[in-house]
Amino acid sequence: MNDLKRMNIKELEDLCENMREQIIEVVGKNGGHLGPNLGVVELSIALHYVYNSPEDKIVWDVGHQSYVHKILTGRKDKFHTIRKKGGLGPFTDPNESVHDQFISGHAGNSLSAATGLAMANPDKDVIVIIGDAAFANGTTLEALNDINGKIKNLTIIINDNEMSIGENVGAISEVFNKVINSHFYLKLRKDVRKLLSRYHITKPIVKPTERLEQSLRSIVTPGGFFNILGYDYIGPM
């Protein structure tokens, strides 16, 4: 972990490549979840680069996305045993490592667990990684409503990969399906600012332009959904 924090960008990129190769090799032999883990390699490394686990709590909503997390937290030499009798489990498990906050299988309960961890550890950061499919889970929405943007040491990362075992349905799913529209918003904002700059139009309409920008942002990005609930939204990234 300390070695990770001393790496430069090139070394981190090489680490990502090595992680992918290791996961592909082991999953090819043992079975397991290949796509979900390959999709969070950079994210997992970034989290452990920035935060200090286990003091800071990293919570995975879907345990079978935690392969990189396992490798980075002292289980690299045992990774070849994953899903084998007596080997590493396929999900996070606090009995396996202090870096695992709770036993997680499939989707939905991470935000509730993370809320409790954040309240119990107000001087530490708690980070929860949850997918777009899991976000429509009832327990997730209950936790989202309960938090109401008031727990300041909790960061929610939505892995909007449009992947799930079954088809995502419902209004919440539709909100995340609109994320592509945010690229339209970003391009529109850039074009408007370029136009104003070209004609040297600045201060007289700064405030109206800012209000228009805020209105557009609330309409065409999923951030509006979270802003209404009291959260600071950054994205998409």
Give the ranges of each region predicted by the language model.
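Short beta-alpha junction loops
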Residues: 133, 160-163
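Generic structural signal for well-ordered, non-membrane alpha-helical segments
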Residues: 12-16, 36-40, 106, 110, ...
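Gly-rich Lys/Arg/Thr-decorated short loops/hinges at beta-loop-alpha junctions or inter-strand turns
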Residues: 1-3, 21-26, 88-100, 124, ...
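A short alpha/beta connector and helix-capping loop motif
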Residues: 137-159, 173-182
